[in-house]
UniProtKB/Swiss-Prot annotation:
One Pfam family here: DUF2476
Stated family: Belongs to the PRR23 family.
Compositionally biased residues, Basic and acidic residues: 243-252
Source species of the chain: Homo sapiens (Human)
Compositionally skewed regions (Basic residues) per UniProt: 253-262
Disordered: annotated segments: 1-52, 225-262
Disulfide bonds: none
Pro residues bias: start-end ranges: 226-242
InterPro entries in the record: PRR23 (IPR018903)
Protein's name according to its UniProt entry: Proline-rich protein 23C
Amino acid sequence: MGSRPCSPSACLAPWWGQQPGGPGPAKRSRLEEPAGPESRAAPSPEDPAGTPAVDALTSMVVLDAGCALRVPLEDVDLVLELAPMSVLRVSLGGHTLIVIPEVLLSSVDECSGAQGDWSAGLEVDVFLGAHGEDVVVEQEVCASVPEIAAEEEAYEEDADSEFPELWMDSAAGSAAGLYPSARSMFSPYREGPIRGPCALAPNPSSERRSPRPIFDLEFHLLEPVPSSPLQPLPPSPSPGPHARPELPERPPCKVRRRLFQE
């Protein structure tokens, strides 16, 4: 009955005080001290950000036709196969692997005249530590100069066979009463006739062209057929002033009378 309640100052230590198993005040003050050069240790090997940057290594491999390159990784084996005219670039971690077919190098050597030993071997054991998610494959398609020239010649031959040349005979055209123009071909545009040469220029690739059974170079555009009953029409006379009747003059409209008062 006569006991007094305990004052707040007589309570136990607050909840943020020292707890069993926790650090004491002395240890807490030690942690708040600035870290010295000894405490600034290098990051662990598991942290890739702390490791110093290593210069990327680039290697080149030349593959023969019908061969493939096998690169052993941690879990799987990476097999690289190339198209005849393509360059493959593979990034394995800090290493870059460039795979080039031998056909492409041989065509480049023939065009430039350079001679070099590009078939040096490559030790792929350096890629054993590369991770599977670090593998990046890029493929580039290349074409040699002889193939491009052959494609251009084939395209020109196709264009020549699709659009045959049509030449006109000036003597036959003038005798039939047509336009005696042996150096012009009429175009559908408004500029007028297109002037062109009347003689065929020698083409070095004419021997390789296929024969043209439908069109012939001796075909005359405006020459009439003798056995045909169709003959060219005479020129039409120009209409005189009496051919078109004159319209009666109408009085000007209301708007014209308001704008232009006489």
